[in-house]
Amino acid sequence: EICACLVGSEMCIRDSYHSSPNWRLPYPEKEAKQLQELVKVAQENEIDFVWAIHPGQDIKWNKEDCELLLAKFEKMYHLGVRSFAVFFDDISGEGTNPVKQAELLNYIDEHFVKVKPDVTPLIMCPTEYNKSWSDPAKGYLTTLGDKLNPSIQIMWTGDRVISDITQDGIQWINDRIKRPAYIWWNFPVSDYVRDHLLMGPVYGNDTQIAHQMSGFVTNPMEHAEASKIAIYSVASYAWNPQKYNSEKTWKDAIMNILPDAATELEFFAAHNSDLGPNGHKYRREESVNLQPTAQSFTESYIKNKTYTEKDFSILQETFSQMIESSDILVAHADKNPIIVEIMPWLYQFKLLGETGNEVLAMVKAYDKNDQSLFMRKYKHVKALQQQMFQIDQTYNQNPYQPGIKTAGRVIKPLIDQTFATVTQCYNQKYSTLLNAETDYMPHKLISDISQIKNLPLQVKINRIQISPALEVIKWPGNGSLTIELDQVYPGENIEIDFGKPEIATWGSLEISANGKDWSKVNFTQEKNLLTASLQQKPIKAVRFTNMQHQEQEIYLRRFIITIDK
C-alpha cells in the first residue's frame, strides 16, 4: 500500500512488515523480491524510494529492539533501499516518549545512516505531528528539537492533521524543532472520506516558504491513477513554489493524463473536488464556475418560486454535460486505467445529471399546470434516486466511508432543494402527498469531543454507525458521545471497539427511550470488542461517557447500533 508519494522524486511505501507487530520480522522471500524489483524500477526512474518503519506501538526501549530495528534496516539496504524513515505517528503509551525516540533515532543515524555514504538523511514522523495535537507544556517537540541530530528531518502536517501550510504555521514548528520542517501535506488523501474523489486544483499552501521547508510530501488517495492530478500539481508547487500556477497546472495534468478526453475529465474533476462534511473540517472548492448561477437560482426559486431563463438554461446545459462527459469517459475505459478507477463515480455522476434535468422538467411542468407531465417526471426522478442509492450501496463498500458521492457541494444540494421545493408546491396546489424527501441523515451525533463531534454517521439498512477514525482520539475526562435517533426503535445490539482492552474501567454505556431519562447497559467484552444485547428495548438515544476525570486515549474503530426496523 502506497501511503505517501514524496515529491521531489521520492516515494515512501508502507506495508504489513513495516509496523507493529511485524516490524521485527524479515519480509517473506516472495515479498522481498517484489520489493527489490520496485526499488530497482524507482531508481531507474530517478526516484528515491523511502522505506518507513512504524515500531512505536509495541517497541521496547532496550538494546534488543534497537538492534532488531537496525537489522531490519540492513535487510532493506540489501534489497536496494537507500532512504529510510521511522514513524511514531498515531500511537499511544510508552512509545510516545520523545527522549527515547531521539535516543533511538540518533543511534540509527550514527550506526547506520552516516556510515553508509549512499544513504540519504533519516526522516522521522513525530507523535505530535500537527499543531492542534501538540502540548507545548509537555515539551515533546522542543525535546526532539534539542536532542535529535541536526541532520534528521522531522515531518509535520501543519496546524491540523489536514491543513494548508502557512507562513505562521511553518515558523511555529521550525522554532520548536530547530530545523526546517519536512512537510507531510495530507492531500489528496481520502482515507477519512473514502466515498469521495478529490480531483480538483491544488491550492492553499504559501508560495513564499520554500526556504523554511526541508521537504514536501503529498499523501495520495487510495486511487493511484486519480491521484496523479494532484501529484502532478504538488510536484509543480514543490519544484518552484513562487511561480506555481494552480489552475494551469491542474489543466496541464489532466491533458497529460487523458489527452483524448481532457475536456470531459476536466469537467468531471471540477465537480468532484470537495470532501463533504468530515471530522477534520477540511473542505475544497467545487463547481466554481457554476456557483454564482446555482446560488442565484436556488435563492430565487426557494424564496419566491421564480428564476431567470438564463440561470435555467445554464443549469440545463450543465446537467446535459454531466451526462455526456460521463458517457465519453466511460468509453475510454480500455485506453486509460484512471477511468476504471473512477467508473462508479462516473455512473453516479451521469445519474445525477439525469436527475437534474428531470427536476428542471418538473419545474417547467408545474409552471404550465401540466399535472400529467409533472407526475411522469416525478416518477422518473424517484427511480433515478433509487438507482443512485443502489450504486451507493453496491460499489466501494469499504468499512469506513462506504459508497459513492459525487458533486456534493453545489450541484446535488441545488437539485435536492429544487426537487423538494417544487414537490411541496405541487402538494399544496393539488392536495397531494408526494414524498419530497431526497437522501438525508435522520439521526444525529452529539459530542463534546472535538475529534468526534464532526464525524459523519452512516446508515446501512438497520445499522447506524459512526465513521471510524484512523488517528488516536483524545477523550477528555467526563466527555461523552451521543447518537440521537429520529424516532424510538426496538434495539437489537450495540458493538463498540475503541482499540483498547480496558474500556470497562472508565466507560459507561447508556440508552434512553425518550432522550431524557437514561439507564445503564451492561456489555460483554472479547479482547477489544464490547457487545451489548438490547433485547428489543425501546431506544431513542445511545450515550457513551468517560466516567473518570482524566483524559483517555482510544482508537474509534467501531461504534454500531443495530435496531429492529
Where are these regions (language model features)?
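The substrate-binding groove and active-site-proximal loops of carbohydrate-active enzymes
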Residues: 19-30, 53-66, 87-101, 128-131, ...
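Active-site groove signature of glycoside hydrolases
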Residues: 72-98, 120-129
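Substrate-binding groove of N-acetylhexosamine-processing glycoside hydrolases
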Residues: 107-133, 141-443, 521, 538
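Disordered, acidic Ser/Thr/Pro-rich linker "stalks" and the adjacent N-terminal cap
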Residues: 411-414, 427-491, 497-507, 515, ...
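Trp- and acidic/polar-enriched beta-sheet ligand-binding modules for extracellular glycan
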Residues: 502-564
